[in-house]
């Protein structure tokens, strides 16, 4: 292949072919894509969305340094939370307040900080400083008035967000590398974390103190673990998604269930339990898979994204996905993947980005870690 474009001189043939493939795939209408014009790192449901709406509102964490409240039904940004100096990786949102008090959203960022925002006005109320590297995950415990944060600095911080201002209560260490995800074991004060190592660690955390339960935890993955999720239909079952190209189910008392080891062709980025008891998974190969948990086989593959899928959520009968390709797509689970391939949707133009070349390289390195 010959070219006069200087930007192509030091790129491999395979890289150029992949870029061409992605450019061609970027015009596909599958999943009715909403192009948000920035790489999407995370999404969370706005659980105050009225049930009568067909599609929900989402809080969207972007590499463009902002978080936004986006209405999928009208394809419109309702509010923007702007103030971070780095990509926003995660967010947690307070429930609808019945006491008349202001509702808040917490966001974590590459700028090492957590910010608290007024959901309605978009005003930044305060900035929580304590981590020394990227903040990668948050977990809000509203009843206890606590916020847990995990970071690339390998620490887990417990914050008292019921006080004014919020206070750093204590910091827990034990991971050898960054923390990617925190989840709570149902009906307990036990929490599980994973990250840029193969181990899954267990902690006892309360407002007065916390510690690692070193005799607990799981060691079975061969690489980074990106997601942890307890099965709502079985509180003793923990699902994990890993860079070793597998999604696995663990029993808290029996260890790994080899029969539910789900093999993928690339890094697994997310796992979701569906209302019907099946499992959905997101992968760096750009696909979303729905698995039959009784057989361990793939039921459907939803294809449309042209970069790594970063998050999947369920709303009613719809599966919602976000991607580094800057789009959010909606898939109807009541129909097969083939019936989610539209042929009358207007094509999208090539994506744009607000990141510098250095930030893009850092983002790609982080996502591929």
From Swiss-Prot:
Keywords of this entry: Repeat, WD repeat
A Pfam family of this chain: WD40
Region of interest (Disordered), ranges: 1-35
InterPro entries: G-protein_beta_WD-40_rep, WD40/YVTN_repeat-like_dom_sf, WD40_repeat_CS, WD40_repeat_dom_sf, WD40_rpt
Gene Ontology CC, one term: nucleus
Ranges occupied by WD repeats: 83-127, 130-169, 174-213, 220-260, 263-301, 304-341
Top-rank lineage group of the source organism: Eukaryota
Coiled coil: none
Biased segments, Basic and acidic residues type: 17-27
Family annotation (CDD domains): WD40
Record protein name field: Uncharacterized WD repeat-containing protein C126.01c
Classification lineage: Eukaryota, Fungi, Dikarya, Ascomycota, Taphrinomycotina
